[in-house]
Amino acid sequence: MKKVRFGIFHLVSLALMCITATNMCAESKAEKQEDIQKVAQQTLQQLYQAQPLAKTAIEKSAGYAVFSDLGIKILFGGTGNGQGVVVNNDTKQKTYMKMVELQAGLGFGISKFRNVFVFKTKAAMNSFINSGWQFGGQATAGVKTADSGGAMQGAVAVDKDVWMYQLTEKGLNVSVTVTGAKYYKDDSLN
């Protein structure tokens, strides 16, 4: 039993080191910002191909955020982290942020996904940026609302005036799960 615990500890430690190493590839602040922006643009293009009306929803919003996340789950728990950028549509100002996630439950594997948040109001966007936003739970439905004209189809409401699209390597994910996730400013990039 001690060998199993020791092995699990080493697997989790290795997984955390791998996640940390992926975020340290770029050397300078400008290179890191450029890498995040490049991933954000690729993610938006992937989203627009999967859900063309998302482009209109994002353009008409107060702003949006794009995060690239990597999660690892081993037996009874998992962890993940990521980074991204929030873009204010009025000012074009970019705020770089990080994400950490904790999961409980049985499982084993590595998951890569990207989240695109759409902020209907400036207040919702500023709250996300400044409050170290965090949430837990599961949302599983994209809906058509009267004020969005179907533009949010494939997205899930995760907070008041905040919608989220989640993309995997296979495309748009209709079932979105975020458990114990926290988003916060990346002081080293802002």
Map each language-model feature to its residues:
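Bacterial N-terminal signal peptides that target proteins for export
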Residues: 2-12
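Bacterial N-terminal signal peptides
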Residues: 10-21
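Small-residue-enriched, tightly packed secondary-structure blocks
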Residues: 27-190
